[in-house]
Amino acid sequence: MINTQIIENLQILLHKEDTTLLEKLSFKENTFSEPLLIAYFNNKKLGTLSSEILTEIMQGFFIEKEPLKIKNSYNQNKIAYIPNIGYYNHNRELVEPILEIEDLEVIKELHPLLNRYLIEFYKGHITNPNPEYRSVWENHIATLKNALTLIKENIPDFFKEFHSANKKIFIHNNPRILNFTSIETLGMLYFYATPYATLMYFVEELIHQGSHNILYHITFDKKDFFKIDAPNTIMRDLTKQKWDYRDIYGAFHGVYTVYKRLECYDILLQKNALEGKDKHELLGRLADQFSRFHTGLELLNLDEVYTEKGKAFYVDLDKKCESIINKYVLLKREFDLSNRDLDFRYEDFCLLNSFEDFLIKDKQGFYNF
């Protein structure tokens, strides 16, 4: 799943930036899939960055260890995160070790290179470019672990894909910073988590956001898939749907991530992997995908937008989505999702969809598909 072209590009950039540094590095795969390495070169495009930052980021991957350098890595909490080593305070004391769960690293303190990616965003508009947030990993670590284990044990093929493209996760407390990934920090997952965050919340977002990172690898060479400049072509310019602020590439990501959620939810239901409130929420989240399917891409002239490879990929995704939706179509009438804004929230879903009524029907086999 790892796109070797990405690794090769990073090695070339490193060679141009600092040949001596490149010679110090272990050439293991995870060295060149470090999200902060990718973020460094993307941040550098915006202005001058000290090469010392690059050394600090990559010193945890040196073949031979050297004295620790952390001067440029301190964040607003005065903690320096050094990949593959740990977290240090201003006295250069190790205050937190690296934490991994099912090979996914949980970021406890964000590196300053990543700050600019966290913004408050609503329906195509940046509402706050410098929001406040804090890490809340400790409050949600058990639920995250359970979600990863559930996916690994029940959807092993997806878990392998997920693991290949997703390396680290940062969990914060600001729900106005919508969950996201970025090709500029490829391999990172950014989640908000409220006190109400459930098992299924993490399951959905691991599948949803994790699939964005998977698709970045698949479609890294966009010319293989698109005849047009997809990231810079706005949907409404082609579909005439005035509300649609998305670019073509972003909308394509939407179809892919809807399909991956539908596919994984179908597997979980067929395996009877969940029960009680977890199953209630799973079915609600599955029904929530219906309105996220066919939101505009189906209106495009496929032959003008896609290459043959891209068209075949899109048509296959579309057919698979439609097949799963048809399988569960009764859920469209079963659940009331009228109070959902952008994100599905189980506490809101329960206001309109009684858990007690669900239990009665579930015991009667109503939700056996």
Predicted feature locations:
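Type-3 copper protein
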Residues: M1-I169, G284-F369
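Short, flexible helix-coil linker/hinge segments at the edges of structured domains or between repeats
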Residues: L110, L114-P131, P175-F180, L186, ...
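Short, charged/polar micro-motifs that form catalytic or ligand-binding hotspots
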Residues: N130-I141, Y192-E205, K240-G254
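Extended, composition-driven regions rather than compact fold-specific motifs
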Residues: P131, E184, V255-K260, D362
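Active-site-proximal segments of catalytic enzyme domains
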Residues: K145-L148, H163-Y192, F202-V203
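Metalloprotease/metallohydrolase-associated module, dominated by Zn2+-dependent proteases
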Residues: E161-K168, H172-T181, I234-T307
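Post-HEXXH active-site segment of zinc metalloproteases
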Residues: S182, Y196-E205, Y216-D244
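Short active-site segment of divalent metal-dependent hydrolases/proteases
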Residues: I207, S211
